[in-house]
């Protein structure tokens, strides 16, 4: 007859084996077959699940060098993320993803222009990504600069990209100032939503993929004080 200690030890060993298998499966790279099998909605859910792991302190620990070797001959990311250059919002970390999982385009204030849109057309139509996430964040310095109309070299022209969002935020009332947190956040929210709209307005390629249900484009907001990512809609 097994002793209680033996039984507990055996159970723990079995659990460790099961957990190891799960972690190993989660570290598997995205192959063309895995990418093809996932739905656009499933791709978004993977990002939501990853953020939940990040918040719970249960990010998956993988052998990244092994993933470097495994992806050397090709890539099949399941999603593309348009994010800010802010050092506090690394998309692969906040969504608990690894090498070869996502495309990441980053620019101050997470806006898009033809260069970024063209990159997203590549990521989706040619490389097969099933979801695009426009990821903003709280306390965004670029958004604050747009709200105040800051002047500094080439930054001055870049900040004009946020003018439509600033105008949208004015409709909510409040003082237009970077010191007004509510106005800044209203601008950041409007910016990600307007950017989602711009992607399909500007790109026939993306518009057709969405119409064919091969792609979803969503807006999200990362709270830099908690790590939580809120998805809109």
Q: What spans do the regions from the language model cover?
A:
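N-terminal secretory signal peptides and thylakoid transit peptides that target proteins
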Residues: 1-14
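Divalent-metal-activated hydrolytic enzyme cores
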Residues: 8-9, 25-74, 100, 109-130, ...
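Boundary at the C-terminal end of the N-terminal hydrophobic targeting segment
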Residues: 21-23
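Short active-site oxyanion
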Residues: 78-80, 129-132
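Short beta-strand segments
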Residues: 82-84, 106, 133-137, 218-222
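Active-site cofactor/substrate anionic-group-binding motifs, chiefly glycine-
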Residues: 85-110, 115
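Gly/Ser/Thr-rich loops at beta-strand to alpha-helix junctions
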Residues: 87-88, 137-142
């Amino acid at each position: 007859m097994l002793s209680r200690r033996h039984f507990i030890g055996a159970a723990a060993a079995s659990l460790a084996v099961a957990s190891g298998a799960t972690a190993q499966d989660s570290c598997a790279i995205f192959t063309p077959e895995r990418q093809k099998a996932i739905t656009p909605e499933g791709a978004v859910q993977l990002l939501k699940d990853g953020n939940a792991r990040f918040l719970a302190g249960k990010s998956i620990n993988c052998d990244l060098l092994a993933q470097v070797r495994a992806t050397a001959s090709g890539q099949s990311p399941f999603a593309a993320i348009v994010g800010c250059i802010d050092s506090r919002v690394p998309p692969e970390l906040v969504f608990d993803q690894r090498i070869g999982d996502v495309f990441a385009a980053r620019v101050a204030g997470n806006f898009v222009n033809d260069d970024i849109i063209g990159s997203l057309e590549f990521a989706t139509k040619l490389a097969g990504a099933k979801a695009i996430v426009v990821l903003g964040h709280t306390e965004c310095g670029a958004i604050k600069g747009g709200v105040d109309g800051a002047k500094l070299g080439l930054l001055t022209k870049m900040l004009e990209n946020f003018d439509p969002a600033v105008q949208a935020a004015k409709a909510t009332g409040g003082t237009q100032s970077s010191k007004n947190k509510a106005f800044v956040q209203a601008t950041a929210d409007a910016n990600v939503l307007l950017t989602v709209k711009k992607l399909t307005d500007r790109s026939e390629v993306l518009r057709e993929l969405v119409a064919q249900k091969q792609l979803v484009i969503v807006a999200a907001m990362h709270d830099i004080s908690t790590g939580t990512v809120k998805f809109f809609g």
